[in-house]
Structure formats: structure tokens, C-alpha cells
Amino acid sequence: MVKHTKSKNDFDAELLLSETSKIGDPWVPIYQTAVDIEAHHFETAMSNLIKQPNINSTVIMRADILKENVFDVENGDSTFVSKLINKVPEFPSENPDDVILHRYLDDIDLRTISLNNSELKLNTKCEVVRRIIPRNPFKDHIINQTCLVLSSSNADPESHTEKESDDSVLVVYIPHIQSSDEIPFYLPPVYGVGILYHKSTLSIQYLPFNYQNYKTSPEIQLSLRNLDVTERPIRIALRLLQTSSKHSLGAKSGYEKRVNHDLVVPKIAFQNRYITLKKKYSSNLVNSWCESTDPKKHVFEDLAIAAFLIELWTVKYKSREDFEFRDLGCGNGLLVYILNMEGYSGKGIDARSRKSWSTYPENVQNNLSEQIIIPSVLLKPHPALSRLIPNVTDNFRYFQAPQLPSKNNCSCEAENVPADDKSTSHTNSSSTLTTYSSANLLESSQVCTTEEFPPNTFIIGNHSDELTCWIPLLGYPFMVIPCCSHALSGAKVRYSPRKQQKSNQQQNVSTYGALVDHTEDLAKQMGWIVEKEMLRIPSTRNAAIIATKRQPHCIDENDEVTQTRVLDILALEGGAEGWVENSINLMKKAPRNH
């Protein structure tokens, strides 16, 4: 017996290739490890892994459960059949050469195995047929697979011991294929995989193809027993053992998921859309990337966000003609490009143009604007003053900031902000300061107040930094993905945890979590009905705050009441003094890379 140590995480496993399987020939044991768990911990963990095979392999996107039979001695049997059982997964593509790979999807009959030679008496407790969807179904085949859970406690309930560690549980995976050369890359090249819990030990067992003939053809088993530990089937076995051990220990310790996904947009719809977009755009975008940032991170993240937005809009709007988007702080413009190319009307705005902008088609370039966002509430008169003097259009304020550039590099050229007749400029150690009036800024084509947006605008804030907390205050439906924490003045800030959390959870609330909560609270103060989704994107900052509807008492609120509400929030937040100056300064700074 050879001991194999995984030093990366101190995981010890014993290699069993020369041993006899406890579930009998023709099974071949591969690895085993000792675990301090009981049978129900293993069952709980494996129930989750059956539903989420992507935990075992990054090649797999998800599993769709097609049918499930549960045999419960105490509570009775139950059966589930999915509406997806007779549907082939769809990944719309305009390219006729894009062919989805799949095998025998109409084969939904449960597989069974013989354990006639087993030392253990096991009966079926649960049987599942799942459909495995790989991340790239244009490269890896979609297949159906039987998953069986067998238990000694189901075999003879009367002889069931009180000491649950004496129970044995076997989980078996059997792909629905007809020959060994049809096995997909993400599975080991065997007829079946067994994961066995027995006497505080977990082990991985392989059932070879043509196992029925193992007595007359010894090479059937020898082909597995002679494998080297570096070969892929053995490495997969170790991975399966590590995962089942880790998740079983997690079940014992009472591990609960920290976040719940797919609360707003169905997982299947999002993932199918993501696969389609990735196939359509990823290769070209990664290969032609001209920014200094990591292309794979930005490309795949924005493809995932685009997929989520498209499916969100499918849920919230009747058609794509019912709205148009504005991506505030759009950065490299990639999200705007993807959405425009998919037929969605909208524009992106950022204080600084990027190299990428000039690489997009002309129609996309025309939808990218180099502007700063100064919400109109900071430049217009108070509603009370507007009632008294209707002709007044600005609040008579003056701001000192560096001179805005006379030209920008984006496709939509903007003019200089005209300085007030009485403005002065002087040389500072770092730059020349110019005085701007609120009237100047309201008239400038380099300033976006958001008031010019059409009424059916949907605002996107994708890691939009200083704009994060402003977006819920602008009066349009939105989705904002917070990133860096800034106050309404544009200054960096660390928000405190919510008051109700301070008594027992304050130590668990991160700076990012506090920012997300604060953004959500601002939206609620503005009368929005807020939804929250933890996006499936390659980023730890993946919380999305979404609002498309207002509370009933705010639906018919007039502009004056809304503006007063914003001003009240500004006062509670400590004001927005410095926002104008900080925004103008952004046009002088180098873009952030995140």
C-alpha cells in the first residue's frame, strides 16, 4: 500500500490499486482516506455534489436534475420529474457552424449496477438522472448520468445500529454512453465511479468498461491497476476523494452557504446565455486586447455581466425596445460593446476615454462619451427657490478645479467648459485652477447631469467606484455592482455596518459588505424596491443591487418631492461638497485598473 500525500493542503490518501474492493470484483479501488465523520454527513455532502458537479471540475458548468426517486423507509417514497427532461439545452448562435455537442440526451433510463460480490449489504436509497452541462458545449459533450445512493441502513432497517459510523454509504456515477471512446474529457474513462463511506473511511472505486468479462479477460482490471499516479484517471480519483472528504467535514461542522445565487435571474437562463456570448465574443476580444489589464479577467467578467443583464431585462421588460441603458463609469467600454452588438440600445460614459474605444465598430464608438457625471441636484436651485423664481436655472455656485482638456480622444468630441467672465486662474504646484459656475457646467457638453437621459433609461454601474452610491439617487431603474467605497463627495470612506448587525455580526461584516449594505439602504430611502443578487462572475466583488420598481407610495411622486428627498439624503450623508471638483480631477488622472 503506497501512501500519497497532497502537501498543498495536507491531504493524505492511500493508493489502493493492488487491493481488493470491499464492494467486490470487478470494482478496482483507487484511493482511500480516513475521515472523522458519520454516514449522514457524507450523504448530505454527496447530495449537494450530485446537484453541483461543477465543484469537482472546472470544465463543468452545472447539472440539470432530470428525475429523482427517493426511497425513504420512515417517510415514504417520492418521485420528481423535471420539465427539462425532454428538452435539449439551447445556446442560440448566429453561426451555423456552431454545433452543440451532446450524446444520447433522450436516454433517460436509470442505470443499475450489480454488487453480487460485495462484502457490504447495500440497498438503493436515492436514484437520480442528471444532465451535465460543460462550460463549453461546443467542445465538450453534454451527457446524461445516473447517480445512485446506496446505504446499509436501507438494506435492513431492523439491524440498523445506533452507532452511525458503522453504517456504509456508496454513491455511484454512471454516464449514459455506449462505449469507452465516448466518455467526455471531464469524466474518468471508466464505466462507473463509486465513492464509498465505510467505517470512517472514504474511498474511490472504479468500475471498468466491459466489467462483465473481467474473469475471462484480466486485462480489463489490469488496465486500471497498472496506471501511474500521475495519469489523469488517478488524478481525477484523488480530486473526487478530496472534494467528498472536504464537503463531508463541512457538513459535520454545520457549514452553511454564505450567499445564495440565482434569486433574480434563473441559473439555467443565465448560464446558457453566458455560454452563447462566450462562444461568440471571447476569443476575438482576448486576442485583440489593447489595454494593460488582464484580458481574460475583464472579458469573461463583462461577458457574464452582459449575460445577466440580458436575462434580467428579459424578466423585467416586455421587449428590448422598452428601454435603453446608460453604463456610467463604463471604463474600457467592453460591456457597452457586447450589449450594443446583441441589439440593445444604450451608451457608455466615462471621465476618460480608453484605447479600446477606437477598436470597436463605429456605431459602438458613437455610443461612448468622455464626460464627467455631475448630478443636476448639485447645480440646480433648491425646489423652494424654483417655486419662488421659476426662471432661475442654476444655484449660483462656483467651483475651482483644473482646466478641463480642450479636446478629448473619444469619437464624440466635446467642447471646453466656458469659464465665467469673472473667473480667475492661477498656477498651482500641480495644475492651473479655473473657476467654473454651475451655469457653465450645466451648459457644457463635457458634463452629464443624467437629466438628459430618456425616461425609459436603465442605469448600469459596473464597479463604478465614486458613482456607486449616487446611482440609486438618480431616479432611474438600475443595477449597480459596488467595488471601491466612496462617499457622495467622491472621497474615499469606510461605511460602518448596519446598526442591527453591531450586536452579534459586526466582526463578520467586511468593508465591502458594509458598502453593499449602504448602497442598498440608499436605494430604499429613495423608495426603490430592492433586489440583491450575488453574481456568478470571476470577482470577489460580485454583489449586484437591482431596482426596477418603486414602493407604491413613491410611484406617482413628482419631481420636486423626489429632488427634496435627494437633498435630504445628501444632508444625512454629510453633503456632497467636493464632488464637482473631484469629478473634474478625474479627467486628469490615469484610469484605475480593476
From Swiss-Prot:
Keywords, comma-separated and alphabetical: Cytoplasm, Methyltransferase, S-adenosyl-L-methionine, Transferase, tRNA processing
EC identifiers of the protein: 2.1.1.211
Domain of life: Eukaryota
Signal peptide: none
GO biological process, one term: tRNA nucleoside ribose methylation
GO molecular-function terms, A-Z: tRNA(Ser) (uridine(44)-2'-O-)-methyltransferase activity
Example of a GO cellular component annotation carried by this entry: cytoplasm
Subcellular localization(s) per the UniProt record: Cytoplasm
Main location: cytoplasm
Catalytic activity of the protein: uridine(44) in tRNA(Ser) + S-adenosyl-L-methionine = 2'-O-methyluridine(44) in tRNA(Ser) + S-adenosyl-L-homocysteine + H(+)
InterPro entries per UniProt: tRNA_uracil_MeTrfase (IPR011671)
PANTHER family hit by this protein: TRNA (URACIL-O(2)-)-METHYLTRANSFERASE-RELATED
Family named by the database record: Belongs to the TRM44 family.
Protein role: Probable adenosyl-L-methionine (AdoMet)-dependent tRNA (uracil-O(2)-)-methyltransferase.
Protein known as: tRNA (uracil-O(2)-)-methyltransferase
Organism, as annotated: Debaryomyces hansenii (strain ATCC 36239 / CBS 767 / BCRC 21394 / JCM 1990 / NBRC 0083 / IGC 2968)
This protein's encoding gene: TRM44
